[in-house]
UniProtKB/Swiss-Prot annotation:
InterPro entries: Ribosomal_bS18 (IPR001648), Ribosomal_bS18_CS (IPR018275), Ribosomal_bS18_sf (IPR036870). Belongs to the bacterial ribosomal protein bS18 family. Pfam families: Ribosomal_S18 (PF01084). It comes from Xylella fastidiosa (strain 9a5c). One of its GO terms (molecular function) is small ribosomal subunit rRNA binding. GO terms for cellular component: cytosolic small ribosomal subunit. This is Small ribosomal subunit protein bS18. Binds as a heterodimer with protein bS6 to the central domain of the 16S rRNA, where it helps stabilize the platform of the 30S subunit. The lineage of its organism: Bacteria, Pseudomonadati, Pseudomonadota, Gammaproteobacteria, Lysobacterales.
Length: 76
């Protein structure tokens, strides 16, 4: 038996019944970004691939519209 117990990852979007991820919802998007501004992979967050693709598109749109910075060198 392993020493450490890993908590099961679950998809937050599936649990809350969210149909589509909005690029204007900055608080949700920031939960899936690292300190440096990189998108956290689904194997770490437990997000389903459908929502991970939507999340990636939403983050890229928000970056393009200057709602979220590309790197950590800029203030949020």
């Amino acid at each position: 038996m392993s020493k450490f117990f890993r908590r099961r990852k679950f998809c937050k979007f599936t649990a809350e019944g969210i149909k589509e991820i909005d690029y204007k919802d900055l608080n949700t998007l920031r939960q899936y970004l690292t300190e440096n501004g990189k998108i956290v992979p689904s194997r770490v967050t437990g997000t389903k691939s459908k929502y991970q693709r939507q999340l990636t598109t939403a983050v890229k749109r928000a970056r393009f519209l200057a709602l979220i910075p590309y790197t950590d060198n800029h203030d949020i």
